[in-house]
Curated annotation (Swiss-Prot):
Gene Ontology CC annotation, any one: plasma membrane
Subcellular location: Cell inner membrane
Organism listed in the record: Rickettsia felis (strain ATCC VR-1525 / URRWXCal2) (Rickettsia azadi)
Record's keyword annotation contains Transferase: yes
Protein name: Phospho-N-acetylmuramoyl-pentapeptide-transferase
Family: Belongs to the glycosyltransferase 4 family. MraY subfamily.
PROSITE patterns, sorted: MRAY_1 (PS01347), MRAY_2 (PS01348)
EC number(s) given by UniProt: 2.7.8.13
Length: 361
């Protein structure tokens, strides 16, 4: 909004000219989302506590230390969604189609998560909305997003770029739409599975969003994309502002979500954040890089899949003491804070590997 209002004056005012730069607006987005989180956080937490008498239901079969979390309110993802959307609407170019498509997906996945959290709180159990129903809704939203991208792009690309290899890409044809839906839905649920400990998912999400802030900027810049031999996608640079807002809102949320958490982001936050990262990876054509940068989310998801299939195949045996993987280490005797910090370190390593693919070809 500010960008669009100040655009006619960029040549007449030094302040207005600053808003011409994506980097300036991205930095401002981090400051604004952090500030909004600090201001609205205590108010929202107090409001959620007044509505949720018992807070988020705690699994009885989980680590014993988790029983101390009883009464902690959920749906804190509302804070992240509101601050991110407000900063984006304030600082991004509102004529950019990618901004509106991404915000649509972000909010839609947030609504699905809210429905799930609401069901858990009102029913006082951890089951929420049926898994198949959530997958169906996620699939429908992802399909709508893919159709919008196909319709609004003059020359939609169905190429899948392979990182670390020069000029290597696979033409998936219209099967790319199915693949894109898988990426978006998979990313949403992978982040959701990772969000099981205080602060665990928040920092890796911030690292991933920060990585895609850089990727969006480079892919949307003709000079940098040609230099790095990346697929140039015009207008994706504005997504840098949105990604920066995600970084700031996640860090602001971490202020209240650090152990011991005052609030959980819930599915409202995890499904929306995972979904928006998947959408941005599809738009920037860096779907495989998302799996690398967000490698922690992939590992957590793989641990659940392996546990379920092995349990069924062996009629009751388990690979891990508990899935997702972070609970396995808790059951193994690791303190929650140690699991969280070590997983943060792993997420940094994955982010660096993923970003190195931009240059190493």
């Amino acid at each position: 909004m500010l960008y669009n209002l100040l655009l006619p004056h960029i040549h007449n005012s030094h302040i207005a000219n600053l808003f011409h730069y994506i980097t300036f607006r991205s930095g401002l987005a981090i400051i604004i989302t952090l500030s909004l989180s600090f201001i609205t956080g205590p108010i929202l937490i107090k409001f959620l506590r007044s509505l949720q008498k018992n807070g988020q239901p705690i699994r009885s079969d989980g680590p014993e230390s988790h029983q101390t979390k009883a009464g902690t309110p959920t749906m804190g993802g509302i804070m992240i969604i509101l601050s991110s959307c407000l900063s984006t609407l304030l600082l991004a170019d509102l004529t950019n189609k990618y901004i509106w498509i991404t915000l649509f997906g972000f909010i839609s996945f947030g609504i699905i998560g809210f429905m799930d959290d609401y069901a858990k709180v009102t029913k006082n159990n951890h089951y929420g909305v049926r898994g198949k129903s959530k997958l169906l809704l996620q699939g429908i939203i992802s399909l709508i997003i893919c159709i919008l991208l196909e319709y609004l792009d003059k020359n939609p690309s169905h190429l899948l770029n392979v990182p670390f290899f020069k000029n290597l890409s696979l033409d998936l044809g219209y099967f790319y739409i199915v693949f894109a839906i898988f990426v978006i839905v998979g990313s949403s649920n992978a982040v959701n599975l990772t969000d099981g400990l205080d602060g665990l998912a928040t920092v890796p999400i911030a690292f991933t969003a920060g990585s895609f802030a850089l990727i969006s900027y480079l892919v949307g810049n003709l000079i940098y994309s040609n230099y790095l031999q990346l697929t140039y996608i015009p207008n994706t640079g504005e997504l840098t502002v949105l990604c920066a807002g995600l970084v700031g809102s996640c860090l602001g949320f971490l202020w209240f979500n650090a152990q011991p958490a005052e609030v959980f982001m819930g599915d409202t936050g995890s499904l929306s954040l995972g979904g928006v990262l998947g959408i941005i990876s599809v738009i920037t054509k860096h779907e495989i890089v998302l799996a690398i940068v967000g490698g922690l989310f992939v590992i957590e998801t793989a641990s659940v899949i392996l546990q379920v299939y092995y349990f069924k195949a062996t009629k009751g045996k388990r690979i891990f003491k508990m899935a997702p993987l972070h609970h396995h280490f808790e059951k193994h005797g690791w303190a929650e804070s140690k699991v969280v910090i070590r997983f943060w370190i792993i997420s940094v390593i994955f982010a660096l590997i993923g970003l190195s693919s931009l240059k190493l070809r």
